[in-house]
Amino acid sequence: MGGSQIWLDTTETLTVHEMLKAICVVSANDCCVAMAEYIAGSQEMFVEQMNKRAKELGMNDTTFKNCHGIDEDGHVTSSYDIAIMSRELITKHPKIMEYTTIWMDSLRDGKSELVNTNKLVRNYAGCTGLKTGSTSVALFNLSATATRDGLSLIAVIMKGETSKIRFAEAQKLLDYGFSNYQYALCGSKGDVVKCVEVNKGLMPTVELTLENDCGALIGKGQNKNVTSDINTVSYTHLTLPTIR
């Protein structure tokens, strides 16, 4: 297999929690294969699922040939596709950041030390992850994520000549984003945006509320120029029964 490993033994048992920790912190390729086999029955079947999901997400320049990213003919992607995948991961599965923000930890009752391969976790304020990768062909790569003042950014660096370069270039991109942009909150989860009449209901009206927070990315200092117009479904009244 090659690459980063924690040298799993066929006789030992690790929990999913421990496997995820090893994958996220030290890029354990053997754990990637073990998890793929656990989820799909084999690495090959898991890779099929990976490619199917990639197409669903619009990752049009990506073809996976394995589950760990080691160089293989036809195994390709782009920085844009990595950004799409990273966004999907941190927005739909935010619990992953409990692993990607670990700087140092251990497995096997402290016998196996884990130190995060992503140095920004320790050195960059607000860093939430996400993943490093390096091979002799792809060189040094990084999908870096960070959050400050409600604004989350992703910076993807590919084919850096050295490990230091990938971290420095990612930091430059993140610094630029945080220096020039901010997140403007337009409405909070649960805010009432409209009241709609209900025909033959116990109550004459029903409130339409925001399912989630909503906002927009704006230039720094442009708050005063932001107005919100929440477009609701053009109902003037509802007839029971309704389906939420």
PLM segments and residue spans:
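Active-site-adjacent loops and short helices of periplasmic peptidoglycan-processing enzymes
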Residues: 1-83, 90-92
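Domain-terminus/edge residues, biased toward the C-terminal soluble/receptor-binding domains
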Residues: 59-63, 71-76, 80-238, 244
